[in-house]
């Protein structure tokens, strides 16, 4: 891989604006990262960009984010929750949080991790306790049809325990979770957009997952980082089973997929395969690894794979040594500068963009040239790079407006830069008069992920853009040491970007998607027959004993439970089943048992169950925790446990 030096230019603005992190970050890299401005003009001056913050006073000049009472948002947003382990549903442009979807960690409001049904999804030990109770969700993405979202599913990763959760977008609930084998630090995630071979399959059937942390394969307690490897994983979108994995050189970070289904890719910040801070930054160029999906699946079909440990998942060899011949290669490593932190697919279906992080550059890779290399028609793989241009300090993630412009966050500069892809390509070819930077906007502060309305689809509409700022500092009322993060909304419908709103959010969201509300068709009342344990008539209620195992069947219709009381014996193993027979939307019922650590909800026509041991004798008032009626306080029943 090329080790060419990437010159690092100075971003616009003075040191004061980036002093909080910029100075510390650059000082921390002294002696590790060679940072120099020799041979490189300042990024803003090189492209004739407007001065940093020149129109920061335009705050509020864009379209209004205020909605009148009863007025609905025009877009949904799906946000990762970070180490709250959930997915969050927002309405845009208002920025109002509508729902939190529990996924990987318990949630006391809905009883996630308490009910038997949720434990089955989350994964439990033989004794009924959860396998994991912490998580770190980073990236959310949704299923596609014909290059646009189809409203079926969304997915989110858990970086801590290498799990992927699927969300049904009809009910906005998590219905499946899969743990990836032989992977640590599962970070990037992206669904495919169509099948690479069968043109009739114009929708998502695979979800690709990147393993960030190299580990010994098979697992072993070795300190030799040279033996650590990372795997790129394919999960079946319907069954959620792991289809196959690819062994690679270096690591995986984020993931992107092409619109024709032929390619997936992951950017790499640790091609050195280093275990320590300085080792991971020693190379001046890292890579974006492309995966030829059809060839990988043909290799699996032909039995050209191995397995690791107890896993039966086929693993093909995607290392550079095993893929030197382009015409048979499964992978292709395009070099990019230095420690890139993001790869994003442009809505015109032509390019992948890698942001440099430790380089002030963004790299534009033309997909047709990558495919040309796989076909033996492109002699040098790095000739797929059609632009590599300076944007500013700390470029991380990129969004698109569908008009040929890209929007990249600059972490150290605390800016969003709007730049034109065609102009960047012209500049890279030698036209130094091409002004590729269109606009800059100061953000508050240290922006990370960014996305725009419909940005990652063929229907990118260039109206709104959201950015997740990792530090809020002075933007909100102080609440002690733990600050909220700052999610900012920006109007990108005009030539100039306009900051519209700040929103404090509980830490720590990462990535998100924004899509038109008409693309989903939510159901607000369940189908009773979808639940095998459903109690369809209150007359079916009762206590049913089989030795020391007892089943209690109860229905609820506001404002009463079907059983006024029920009796148990100390030591009974109890499974309590509750069905909400109300058919009106928003009539959700709760069920709590004091001293037994039980609380859960049932939505209209939903059935849920809990299992516990009646180990405390006495009278316990089970009551409805979710307000549903004027006689809400009277909605209770007695559980009597006899000694």
UniProtKB/Swiss-Prot annotation:
Cu cation Z4 binds at residue 510. Ca(2+) 2 binds at residues 269, 272, 280, 286, 339. Pathway: Nitrogen metabolism; nitrate reduction (denitrification); dinitrogen from nitrate: step 4/4. It comes from the Bacteria. Cu cation A1 binds at residues 589, 624, 628, 635. It catalyses: N2 + 2 Fe(III)-[cytochrome c] + H2O = nitrous oxide + 2 Fe(II)-[cytochrome c] + 2 H(+). Cu cation Z3 binds at residues 139, 449. Residues 548-643 are annotated as: COX2-like. It is found in: Periplasm. One of its GO terms (cellular component) is membrane. Residues 1-46 form the signal peptide. Predicted to be exported by the Tat system. The position of the signal peptide cleavage has not been experimentally proven. One of its GO terms (molecular function) is calcium ion binding. The keyword DNA damage does not apply. Binds 2 calcium ions per subunit. Cu cation Z1 binds at residues 341, 397. This is Nitrous-oxide reductase. The gene is nosZ.
């Amino acid at each position: 891989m090329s080790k060419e030096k990437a010159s690092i230019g100075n971003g616009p603005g003075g040191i004061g604006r980036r002093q909080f992190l910029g100075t510390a970050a650059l000082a921390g890299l002294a002696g590790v990262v060679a940072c120099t401005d020799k041979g490189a003009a300042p990024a803003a001056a090189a492209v004739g960009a407007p001065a940093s913050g020149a129109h920061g006073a335009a705050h509020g000049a864009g379209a209004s984010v205020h909605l009148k009472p009863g007025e609905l948002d025009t877009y949904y947003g799906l946000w990762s929750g970070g180490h709250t382990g959930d997915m969050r549903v927002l309405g845009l442009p208002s920025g109002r949080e509508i729902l939190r979807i529990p996924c990987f960690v318990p949630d006391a409001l809905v009883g996630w991790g308490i009910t038997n049904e949720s434990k089955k999804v989350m994964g439990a030990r033989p004794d009924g306790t959860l396998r994991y109770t912490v998580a770190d969700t980073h990236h959310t993405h949704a299923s596609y049809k014909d290059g646009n979202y189809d409203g079926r599913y969304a997915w989110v990763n858990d970086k801590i325990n290498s799990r992927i959760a699927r969300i049904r977008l009809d009910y906005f609930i998590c219905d499946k979770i899969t743990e990836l084998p032989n992977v640590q630090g599962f970070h990037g995630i992206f669904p495919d957009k169509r099948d690479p071979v069968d043109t009739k399959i114009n929708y998502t059937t695979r979800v690709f997952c990147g393993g960030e942390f190299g580990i010994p394969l098979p697992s072993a307690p070795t300190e030799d980082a040279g033996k650590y490897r990372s795997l790129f994983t394919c999960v079946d979108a319907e069954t959620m089973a792991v289809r196959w994995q690819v062994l690679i050189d270096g690591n995986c970070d984020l993931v992107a997929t092409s619109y024709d289904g032929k390619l997936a890719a992951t950017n790499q910040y640790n091609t050195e395969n280093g275990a320590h801070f300085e080792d991971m930054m020693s190379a001046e160029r890292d890579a974006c690894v492309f995966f030829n999906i059809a060839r990988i699946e043909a290799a699996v079909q032909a039995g050209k794979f191995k397995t690791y440990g107890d896993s039966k998942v086929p693993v093909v060899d995607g290392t550079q040594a095993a893929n030197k011949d382009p015409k048979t290669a499964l992978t292709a490593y395009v070099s990019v500068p230095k420690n890139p932190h993001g790869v994003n697919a442009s809505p015109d279906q032509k390019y992948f963009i890698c942001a440099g992080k430790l380089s002030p550059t963004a790299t534009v890779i033309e997909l047709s040239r990558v495919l040309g290399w796989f076909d033996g028609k492109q002699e040098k793989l790095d000739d797929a790079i059609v632009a590599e241009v300076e944007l500013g300090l700390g470029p991380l993630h990129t969004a698109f407006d569908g008009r040929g412009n890209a929007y990249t966050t600059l972490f150290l500069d605390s800016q969003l830069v709007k730049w034109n892809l065609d102009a960047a390509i012209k500049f890279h070819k030698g036209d130094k008069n091409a002004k590729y930077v269109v606009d800059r906007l100061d953000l508050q502060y240290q922006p990370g992920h960014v996305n725009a309305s419909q940005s990652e689809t063929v229907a990118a509409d260039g109206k709104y853009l959201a950015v997740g700022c990792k530090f809020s500092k002075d933007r909100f009322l102080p609440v002690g040491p733990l600050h909220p993060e700052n999610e900012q909304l920006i109007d990108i419908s005009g030539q100039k970007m306009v900051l519209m709103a700040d929103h404090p959010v509980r830490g720590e969201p990462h990535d998100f998607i924004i899509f038109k509300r008409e693309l989903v068709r939510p159901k607000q009342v369940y189908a009773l027959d979808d639940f095998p344990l459903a109690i369809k008539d209150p007359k079916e209620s009762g206590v049913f004993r089989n030795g020391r195992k007892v089943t209690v069947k109860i229905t609820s219709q506001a404002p009463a439970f079907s059983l006024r009381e029920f009796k148990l014996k100390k030591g009974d193993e109890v499974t309590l089943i509750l069905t909400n027979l109300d058919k009106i939307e928003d009539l959700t019922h709760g069920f709590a048992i004091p001293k037994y650590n039980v609380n859960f909800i049932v939505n209209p026509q939903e059935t849920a169950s809990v299992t516990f041991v009646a180990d405390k004798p006495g009278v316990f008032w089970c009551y409805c925790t979710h307000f549903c009626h004027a006689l809400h306080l009277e909605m209770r029943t007695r559980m009597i446990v006899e000694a």
